[in-house]
Amino acid sequence: MEIKNKKVVVTGAASGIGKELCIAFKSHGAASICAVDVNLDGAQETAQQISGMSLFADVSKEEDIKNVIEKTTKEFGGIDIFCSNAGIGGLPGFFESETADWQKIWEINVQAHIHAAKHVLPQMLDRGEGYLVNTSSAAGLLTQLGASSYAVTKAAAVSF
């Protein structure tokens, strides 16, 4: 994948893998990078570090993802690479968890990928190029004791 002069969006960019992706894209010559996170202060810090743009988004909400795509498309003139990276873990174990716990992790770790695809792929298909990168985990391939909700969502992300 050629990075130089590409317009990039990364969700979950306030810390961890998302922040490091932004830094890596910048170091490989990306033209424009938008750091997206529910933690806007963290996204702004990342954006400052890479001379990029930052936006707030709760990726569990389709409307937030749609707005990010619309705003960055308008600002950058399109999106070449969309990294759907935001994710959560650390929820209660199977017997301790509630339906709301499962719904929350599903919306963030799976639905966010689906919403991103729905709203960013049309412009990429129209241009005949672009990359949608969905972050998952080895937990989606291996059983993890005490992490069933996380593992299930990561397996779904691998399959999507």
Sequence positions of predicted segments:
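Active-site loop immediately N-terminal to the catalytic Tyr-X3-Lys motif
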Residues: F95, L142-S148
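Active-site helix of classical SDR
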Residues: A117, T153
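The beta1-alpha1 cofactor-binding region of Rossmann-like NAD(H)/NADP(H)-dependent oxidoreductases
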Residues: L40-D41, A57-N67, T99
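Substrate-binding pocket helix/loop in short-chain dehydrogenase/reductase
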Residues: G93-W106
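Conserved glycine-rich Rossmann-like NAD(P)H-binding loop of the short-chain dehydrogenase/reductase
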Residues: A30-A43
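Canonical Rossmann dinucleotide-binding motif of NAD(H)/NADP(H)-dependent dehydrogenases/reductases
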Residues: I3-S32
